[in-house]
Amino acid sequence: MGEHPSPGPAVAACAEAERIEELEPEAEERLPAAPEDHWKVLFEKFDPGSTGYISTGKFRSLLESHSSKLDPHKKEVLLALADSHADGQICYQDFVNLMSNKRSNSFRQAILQGNRRLSSKALLEEKGLSLSQRLIRHVAYETLPREIDRKWYYDSYTCCPPPWFMITITLLEVALFLYNGVLLDQFVLQVTHPRYLKNSLVYHPQLRAQAWRYVTYIFMHAGVEQLGLNVALQLLVGVPLEMVHGATRIGLVYVAGVVAGSLAVSVADMTAPVVGSSGGVYALVSAHLANIVMNWSGMKCQFKLLRMAVALICMSMEFGRAVWLRFHPSAYPPCPHPSFVAHLGGVAVGITLGVVVLRNYEQRLQDQSLWWIFVTMYTIFVLFAVFWNIFAYTLLDLKLPPAP
């Protein structure tokens, strides 16, 4: 499971080193194997005194003289970085970070706070793009609020690996729903079938000791009405987010929402079962919508207000359906219908952990204080819920519905 769809730093560094060697004939001598050493040899040609800095003038001259051979977007970022240094010098580490596809907060700030803003035409103004290039550009504008990040993503995305996590989850959900529908001979409001809860994937309070049920419940849906909305949101929101942020980060937010959803039900709605992937879906969509609101002026996706309104209406309708079903007379008394609290657990994860992930494109999450705050809060909640499930049901002398 990769963190980001672009190649790793070492691979990107070696590829870029070969490109620079083509641009600069003087760098044709044999270089050491380590990626940073490639850059050190080139850097030292412009820093004969080994000061650790080169003048921005020399740096600009190198880029301008080979502008026809160097990727225009990467050249633009390099120039912005060079012009951001008021002392007229660029340090070796910034040079290595850019060439190696390594991003840091200080590196981002050097660009964003520079004297020269990125002034060439934006991605939206470029013509003659292929269908795949237009798709990548569309995804960049749908998910990233900064032009510098959009250009970086556009240049580095290779579709290797593809957004496999969300697609795999979606295919499994659809396949298991169809299988269960054929088995029960019911597709609409499938959850009302008397044998529905007998499936070993459903979370049931009487079987809460079977830990896998806290996750596998996402593969069982109340009916085609719940499945349809969740699948649509996973494909329309989850897949683009995974293309940008990678399967590891998006999978982390999704699974965290799923687990938080079932644990929230076990604490707040103790007698109810749980089905559906709404916990994970609501985590992703809530994080995406919150990121748009927090970066409203920077997000350039078309009709963003209308699309946000449509997304909120769809989420509200699904939540309303879940609330109605929860209090509808049960098809298998005394056990109630599935709970709606998992939706709220997903939202809580989305506006905390999810927002931190989406706001820090290609940044180390370990360096973000908010990340550790929310991870700590999430861990405390999980531990609390585990102890609650072990002790509270007995202490409260709660009468649970019998196992299906």
UniProtKB/Swiss-Prot annotation:
EC main group: hydrolase
Annotated Gene Ontology cellular component terms: membrane
Annotated EC: 3.4.21.105
Membrane topology: Multi-pass membrane protein
Residues at the catalytic site: S278, H343
Principal location listed in the UniProt entry: membrane
InterPro entries in the record: EF-hand-dom_pair, EF_hand_dom, Peptidase_S54_rhomboid_dom, Peptidase_S54_rhomboid_met, Rhomboid-like_sf, Rhomboid_IM_Serine_Proteases
EF-hand domain span: 34-69, 70-105
Molecular function per GO: calcium ion binding; serine-type endopeptidase activity
Domain of life of the organism encoding this protein: Eukaryota
Compartments where located: Membrane
Segments crossing the lipid bilayer: 164-184, 227-247, 250-270, 274-294, 305-324, 338-358, 371-391
Keywords (A to Z) from UniProt: Hydrolase, Membrane, Protease, Repeat, Serine protease, Transmembrane, Transmembrane helix
Biological process, per Gene Ontology: proteolysis
Catalytic activity line of the entry: Cleaves type-1 transmembrane domains using a catalytic dyad composed of serine and histidine that are contributed by different transmembrane domains
Role description: May be involved in regulated intramembrane proteolysis and the subsequent release of functional polypeptides from their membrane anchors.
Family affiliation: Belongs to the peptidase S54 family.
Protein name: Rhomboid-related protein 3
